[in-house]
Amino acid sequence: MVTPTPSRLVMAHTGELTGEELGAVRALMDAAFDDFTEDDWSHGLGGMHALVVTGDEVLAHGSVVMRRVLVAGRSWRCGYVEAVATAPTRRGKGHASMVMAALEGLAPAYDLMALSTSPAGQSFYGSRGWQPWRGPSSVMTPHGTEPTPDEDGAILVLAHDLDLDAPITCDWRDGDVW
């Protein structure tokens, strides 16, 4: 009888991951999402990664990168969650919950934790205490602030005492700004 290799959680900064490890994470993203772009990949780099691995297989991943968001006239240090995925054949086993618990543990390092999700992810994140931002969203572009109405309702924040009905503005980046 073959004993399955137990899964384990690995936390590492992007700079601590090998090219092989990053390649495995990228392969996971491509398998999990039909439309994962180079910009999406770039957004998940430069911060802390949580990986659930077994042997040399990456079962699940998520990262937190530092961004700036404007709320109530103040620039907040935001831990922004990116690239959360579980291998399609490994879903439903708690791997994404392991990843999120590790990433949520980084909250004390930031003023605010946020993410943007699809409708399919709303219940998962909501069950973990993430709340929808109810106010209008926008992005600070090189040409000024522009509304991002397609993101309204998709932006979630980890339980925080901010006014969730206030306008929220993120910093500029290529690809999906939220």
Model regions: which residues?
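A structured, mid-to-C-terminal "fold-capping" secondary-structure block
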Residues: 149-178
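Conserved catalytic-core motifs of GNAT/GCN5-like acyltransferases
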Residues: 131-157
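Conserved active-site tyrosine of GNAT-family acetyltransferases
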Residues: 125, 130
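Conserved GNAT acetyl-CoA-binding A-motif
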Residues: 105-118
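Short glycine/proline-centered loop/turn elements that form peptide/ligand docking sites
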Residues: 96-100, 120, 138-144
